[in-house]
Amino acid sequence: MRPSGRAPNELRPVSLERGVVKYAEGSCMVKFGDTRVLVTATLEERLPPWLKGQGRGWVTAEYGMLPRATHERVRREASAGKQSGRTVEIQRLIGRSLRTTVDLVALGERQITIDCDVIQADGGTRTASITGAWVALADCLQWMKARNMLKNDNVLRDNVAAISCGIYNGTPVLDLDYAEDSEAETDANFVMTGDGRLVEVQGTAERTPFSQEEFLQLMALAQNGIGRLVELQKIAMA
């Protein structure tokens, strides 16, 4: 029995609301149960120095948590003078995931920066960030299209979304909240495109090693869950 009472293959209530920030070219408020992330997409007419003159653009991401996004206040990383290894890992993951779905040549020599700010954390902040980041990116590209700023209409080649899975009390389950994640024997994150291809898989045995059969069960749960998330992304962008 899951603490929330959900079925093993049941997502938390998910909400993807785009266009929530007045000044950003693209934005999305994403909610996975009690996890909430505000995502913005900013268009910048500049590129990293190493990309200049190559005839293509770039999509990058930054990630952070508000001090009281968690049960106890967490010091702002800016006040500590450096980002944690976890923060760097997550924002690189978000950027990598988004770039797999973007035609960077069609984007042109400009950069889109995705900012993911966790307002409230109850498990799955990186997967929620990726799922909401795609909506914010699509919102930004729609803004650009309306202003005839794109070389063609196919800059965004596919959706990308992410979900967590794990083995909790011996049972493979979908979309772990904090109570489950902190007690799970195994936890994994899956990032997939809209057509079901894998972008990234992160899996860790916290207590007991897991079998290939259990991994395939987790992946099947993830495929099903991400399919539903992609449908919600499409609804958000309709």
From Swiss-Prot:
It is an enzyme of class 2 (transferase). The keyword Cytoplasm does not apply. Keywords: Nucleotidyltransferase, RNA-binding, rRNA processing, Transferase, tRNA processing, tRNA-binding. Phosphate binds at residues 86, 124-126. InterPro entries: ExoRNase_PH_dom1, ExoRNase_PH_dom2, ExoRNase_PH_dom2_sf, PNPase/RNase_PH_dom_sf, Ribosomal_Su5_D2-typ_SF, RNase_PH, RNase_PH_bac-type, RNase_PH_CS. Its EC number is 2.7.7.56. Gene3D superfamilies: GHMP Kinase, N-terminal domain. It holds the Pfam family RNase_PH. One of its GO terms (molecular function) is 3'-5'-RNA exonuclease activity. It comes from the Bacteria. One of its GO terms (biological process) is tRNA processing. It catalyses: tRNA(n+1) + phosphate = tRNA(n) + a ribonucleoside 5'-diphosphate. PROSITE patterns: RIBONUCLEASE_PH (PS01277). Homohexameric ring arranged as a trimer of dimers. Phosphorolytic 3'-5' exoribonuclease that plays an important role in tRNA 3'-end maturation. Removes nucleotide residues following the 3'-CCA terminus of tRNAs; can also add nucleotides to the ends of RNA molecules by using nucleoside diphosphates as substrates, but this may not be physiologically important. Probably plays a role in initiation of 16S rRNA degradation (leading to ribosome degradation) during starvation. NCBIfam families: RNasePH. Belongs to the RNase PH family. This is Ribonuclease PH.
